[in-house]
Regions:
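Anionic, Ser/Thr-rich low-complexity intrinsically disordered regions
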Residues: 1-153
Length: 153
């Protein structure tokens, strides 16, 4: 999907190619969402017998969505590392990318720690294992007005 996102931003892309690519991106996003929600279902089963502390709190995102964010961050790190070493780029470009790479790696360390802490807090009853479903509508023939109107005609 990462490369699809690069291609779709090409000003010279033909409309028909862009439409095909947009559908591939939507399909890929839906598959990713389904996988993330399946991982969260695993965590729900794993932690369902945890006795919550009286002052247990919720989190803004579930473990699986945090892991999804981590996977995107790792992709950014990979591509930023490529850019920071690209010999056809200017020295200034490589320097800026190297600085961004340092920031991305720090964010990765912080996010890994936060995910570990979240899972530990859930396992010890300090955080409530709660999932916020994405409820994607654009691929659903019953929820997307364009799709359900098309099926009526």
């Amino acid at each position: 999907q990462w490369h699809y996102e690069d291609v779709i931003r090409d000003d010279g892309i033909k409309p028909k190619e862009a439409l095909i690519l947009k559908r591939k991106i939507d399909h890929s996003n839906q598959k990713r969402t389904n996988l993330v929600e399946a991982i969260d279902d695993y965590f729900i089963r794993k932690f369902k017998k945890i006795i919550l502390k009286k002052n247990a709190t919720i989190n803004t995102e579930s473990p699986a969505w945090a892991i999804d964010r981590l996977s995107i961050l790792v992709l950014k790190i990979y591509h930023m590392a490529e850019e920071s070493g690209r010999i056809t780029a200017t020295k200034d470009h490589r320097k800026k990318c190297s600085q961004k790479l340092l920031i991305l790696n720090e964010q990765k360390s912080d996010l890994c720690l936060a995910i570990d802490q979240l899972i530990k807090d859930i396992s010890e009853g300090r955080k409530i294992m709660k999932v916020y479903r994405q409820m994607k509508m654009y691929n659903d023939e019953d929820l997307n007005p364009i799709l359900y109107k098309k099926n009526k005609d």
